[in-house]
């Protein structure tokens, strides 16, 4: 049976589509021609071949291959030379830039002497100003670490002037067990008059103070049970006044976070000095009139010398910005009892500071994304607890009383003149009875590192080694020049090796030529002039 004819699709198009296709084709051809014109006419390189009938064909091809290899090697060598030149230029430019940067740094270090605008210089000058203007100096000590918060340099400055008196105030006595405070009072009172003290926790601001009857501040302080030790301190200061008509200036000094401004606020019974949980709140000298006979001078914190142990640097630093919290926690953990710290925070045993902070972060729920413990936050928490009142710790006094080298018997007699030691001991005993001291079983024992040295002269803050800095920079420049010379020697050595390789290659080729010529017979010169065109049977016929 004949199959039905299948109907093929028609090739007819609409005019719109056909003209569109033709237009696209024309545009494509035009574009191709344009690009061909840009590149220029292609020149096909003719392959220069050696006919088979030519004698010494193998030798000629070998020579051609050798020339090609030499040209390629020459190109590679030129390329390497260009790269080396570019690298040298780049190194020279970098060296110039580095030299200019080093000069700028050198100039900055030369100019970076401590100017009067520097905060450390300002603090040092303010402290010295307080020491000069004061008749009586009250050094505030932290009862948790009295030896570590004591500054022998400041005491020496005070004791050099014969008319000044020096007292010790054992602040934060309510954070230490009573027996420890009694022992520290015995140790410190053997050198200078010492008074235990506790600041008032909450003081009403002057702007929010209600109208009251005018009562002398000293009389109000005597009857105030919230400030133990204030009555004893005022009694001593009044006994040191030369007369009722003359007033004395009392300078309050000490390291950061010992409570200097809080002591003045507690004595004044009003918020006259700025206080805060952060270190270094007081920046300038402030005079407060306590009563007609006593004027208190609030001073900034003493500047810690960088030659102190790490624990003293962390705990006594005048600003929190200079304190590395993790390093501070590591230094603190090395000097405190592990068992008591574990009981305080209810954490397991740990091997190092990082493991302790990890356990503390898990205990307090301080976790980041993915359950990663926030060790920085835990370190900040532990450091703030240590600096504040949450973490209760104390230092044991020395077994045998060690007198400071700058305090002699004459100094002890001069400082205690006009002050009855028996009355002071009785007053201190009554003050200790009024304090609510914690039990020693729940407190961490801390190993003190001794007195903390401070910077009292602003010239010690100036950078004293500009010449050493210049010598170091010159040494670095000399080392860079030596490196450049070594690189140049290496480049010359590599070039010599390449020349030797090329010479050896040419020698091998010439030896191969000689062997071929000996085996093939006398060489034929194709470049010979066409003078001997006549045929000679004797010479031409072989």
From Swiss-Prot:
InterPro entries hit by this protein: G_CP_dom, Gnl3_N_dom, GTP-bd, GTP-bd_ortho_bundle_sf, P-loop_NTPase, TRAFAC_YlqF/YawG_RiboMat
UniProt subcellular location: Nucleus; Nucleus, Nucleolus
Keywords on record: Coiled coil, GTP-binding, Nucleotide-binding, Nucleus
GO cellular component: nucleolus; nucleus
Gene3D superfamilies xrefs: 1.10.1580.10, P-loop containing nucleotide triphosphate hydrolases
Chain intervals with Acidic residues compositional bias: 472-500
Domain remark text: In contrast to other GTP-binding proteins, this family is characterized by a circular permutation of the GTPase motifs described by a G4-G1-G3 pattern.
Family to which this protein belongs: Belongs to the TRAFAC class YlqF/YawG GTPase family.
Name of the protein in its database record: Guanine nucleotide-binding protein-like 3
Organism encoding this protein: Xenopus laevis
Gene transcribed to yield this protein: gnl3
């Amino acid at each position: 049976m004949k199959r039905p004819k299948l109907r093929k699709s028609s090739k007819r198009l609409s005019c719109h589509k056909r003209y569109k296709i033709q237009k696209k084709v024309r545009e494509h051809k035009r574009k191709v021609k344009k690009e061909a014109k840009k590149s220029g006419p292609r020149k096909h390189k003719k392959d220069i071949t050696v006919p088979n009938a030519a004698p010494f064909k193998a030798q000629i091809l070998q020579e051609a291959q050798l020339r090609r290899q030499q040209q390629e090697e020459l190109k590679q060598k030129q390329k390497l030379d260009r790269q080396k030149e570019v690298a040298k230029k780049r190194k020279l430019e970098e060296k110039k830039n580095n030299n200019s940067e080093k000069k700028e740094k050198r100039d900055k270090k030369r100019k970076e002497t401590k100017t009067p605008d520097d905060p450390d210089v300002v603090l040092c000058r303010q402290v010295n100003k307080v020491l000069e203007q004061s008749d009586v100096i009250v050094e505030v000590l932290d009862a948790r670490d009295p030896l570590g918060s004591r500054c022998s340099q400041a005491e020496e400055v005070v004791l050099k002037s014969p008319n000044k008196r020096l007292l010790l105030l054992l602040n934060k006595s309510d954070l230490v067990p009573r027996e420890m405070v009694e022992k520290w009072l015995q140790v410190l009172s053997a050198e200078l008059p010492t008074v235990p003290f506790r600041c008032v926790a909450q003081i009403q601001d002057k702007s929010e103070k209600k109208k009251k009857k005018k009562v002398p501040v000293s009389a109000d302080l005597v009857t105030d049970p919230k400030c133990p030790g204030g009555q004893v301190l005022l009694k001593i200061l009044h006994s040191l006044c030369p007369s009722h008509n003359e007033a004395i200036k009392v300078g309050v000094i000490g390291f950061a976070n010992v409570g200097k401004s809080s002591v003045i606020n507690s004595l004044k019974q009003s918020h006259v000095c700025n206080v805060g949980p952060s270190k270094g709140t007081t920046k300038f000298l402030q005079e407060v009139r306590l009563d007609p006979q006593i004027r208190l001078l609030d001073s900034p914190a003493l500047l810690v010398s960088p030659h102190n142990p790490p624990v003293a640097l962390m705990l006594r630093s005048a600003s929190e910005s200079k304190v590395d919290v993790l390093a501070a926690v590591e230094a603190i953990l090395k000097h405190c009892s592990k068992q008591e710290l574990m009981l305080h925070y209810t954490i397991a045993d740990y091997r190092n500071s990082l493991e302790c902070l990890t356990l503390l972060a898990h205990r307090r729920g301080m976790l980041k994304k993915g359950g990663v413990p926030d060790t920085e936050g835990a370190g900040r928490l532990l450091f703030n607890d240590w600096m504040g009142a949450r973490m209760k710790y104390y230092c044991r006094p020395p077994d045998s009383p060690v007198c400071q080298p700058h305090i002699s018997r004459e100094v002890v007699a001069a400082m205690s003149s006009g002050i009855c030691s028996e009355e002071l001991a009785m007053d201190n005993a009554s003050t200790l009875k009024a304090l609510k001291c914690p039990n020693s079983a729940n407190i961490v024992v801390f190993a003190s590192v001794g007195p903390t040295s401070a910077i009292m002269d602003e010239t010690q803050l100036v950078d004293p080694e500009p010449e050493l800095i210049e010598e170091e920079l010159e040494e670095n420049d000399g080392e860079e020049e030596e490196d450049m010379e070594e690189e140049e020697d290496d480049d010359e050595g590599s070039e010599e090796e390449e020349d030797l390789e090329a010479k050896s290659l040419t020698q091998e080729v010439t030896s191969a030529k000689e062997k071929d010529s000996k085996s093939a017979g006398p060489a034929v010169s194709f470049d010979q002039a066409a003078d001997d065109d006549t045929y000679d049977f004797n010479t031409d016929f072989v």
